[in-house]
Amino acid sequence: LMIRSGAPDEFGSAYRLLSGAVTPRPIAWVSSRSPDGHDNLAPYSFFNVVSIDPPVLMFSPVGRAPDGLKDTARNILGDAGTGERGDGDAAGSSAFVIQLASVDLAEAMNASSATLDHGESEFEHAGVTPVEADEVDAARVAEAPVAFECELYEAHGVGGSTMILGELIRAHVDEVLLTDSEFDITDYDPLGRLSGGLYADTRNRLELERPD
């Protein structure tokens, strides 16, 4: 199977290959705020941890909206797409919250990916509750078992996508997932993305002992 970058119709082929083969992927359920105070919520499965010291997470909105950056990226980075204000550009908030959706929030997470009219709330459309973040200018999903408040660390354009890195400022974790103040995966059931409309849970687990 040959994939040639830049060839006609190769974006679709590459997307189907990579999104189908690189699975399951964790899902960043990202909330952000526009300059006019509108709260946005959307899921992104090109997402992971990239550093522990400092604690940095990355997600990447793939592709662009017809009029430029997708709402999440524009809210964080501003019209210039850099996190800085250009001539005539609105500055971004440089802030966002990454939620991890559990399986029982799958329908809500999926609903938040709908294309809504400007000013419509993805929180309301998905039936979840916005709660003001403690440290950053954004709302978070009250029902999410894990939420990471982040400040923009770096952003990079990669082809037609935008890689956004955020430094973890504050974490919110459901008490049932904590044992002696440490994260306990026993009752954690995060949603994973496969391909198309397929998702995975993490109920079936395999434990391996690491070799010396």
Predicted segments with their positions:
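Basic, polyanion-binding surface patches
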Residues: 1-212
